[in-house]
Amino acid sequence: MMNKKWWHNKVAYQIYPKSFKDTNGDGIGDIPGIISKLDYLKDLGVDILWISPMYQSPMVDNGYDISDYYAIDPMFGSMDEMKQLIKEAKKRNMYILMDLVVNHCSSEHEWFQKAMADPEGEYGSYFYIKDGKDGQPPTNWRSYFGGSVWEKIPGYDNKFYLHSFAKEQPDLNWENETVREKIYEMICWWMDQGLSGFRIDAIMNIKKDLTWSDLKPDGPDGLADVYKITGKVEGIGDFLMEMKHRCFEP
C-alpha cells in the first residue's frame, strides 16, 4: 500500500509570474505581487503554488533558458524577496514549487560560454558537441522549434552543439557525472532555501540515443523529430532515481 505523501489531496495552482501581479508599475508581474495575493489564493483553497521560471535568464524562451540557476531575474525581484515568499507561504501552510529546466541551459550560462571558448576542454563535455559531416550537421534530427538540432560552433568549420529546443538552449550532457552532480547540488541548495519541490520541464529529453544515427525523414525538410531519439531510450529511470536519492530523500 502506498504511503500518503504531503502533496496528496492538495490543490495546486500555477502562477505565470510575468502576468500575475505587478507591484512596481513596470508592466511585469513580480514576487511582491505573488506575496500580496497569498491570502486570496489561500481563501480559494490553494495549497501548492507552482511558479513558472523566475531564474536569471535572457528570456529567449520565457525563462526556460536559464543563465544562472542560483539567481532570481531582476525583472521579478530579488533573492531576499524569494525567501520572503517562501516564508510567507509557510505561515499559511502553503507549499512553493518552482519550475526547473535541467535538460538544457541558456547559451549565456557560464558553462556554455566556457565550452564555446574551448569545445574540447572540460566544459565542452558538459554539452553534446560533435563533428559534422563535411561541414553539415552530424544527424538529421529536427528540434522542437523547427530546423536542425545542431548549431555550428563559431570559429569551427565542422563542430556542432546539440539543442533540442532553440539554439540559445544547448542541451546539457547528462551522461557526464560532473554535470549531474552540479545539477543535484543546485537542486539541494534550493530545497535548503525552503522550497517543497519542483516541476521539472522537458525531463523526458535528458536521455539521448547515443548512436547518433540518422532517422527516416518525416517531413519535406529531410529531418526527423528529435523526440524519436528520446521517447524510447532506456536509462532515463536511472537518472531520475539517482536524482531522487541525492535530492529528495532524507
Where are these regions (language model features)?
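Receiver (REC) domain switch/active-site residues of two-component response regulators
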Residues: 196
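Acidic/aromatic-lined carbohydrate-recognition and catalytic surfaces
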Residues: 2-188, 192, 204-250
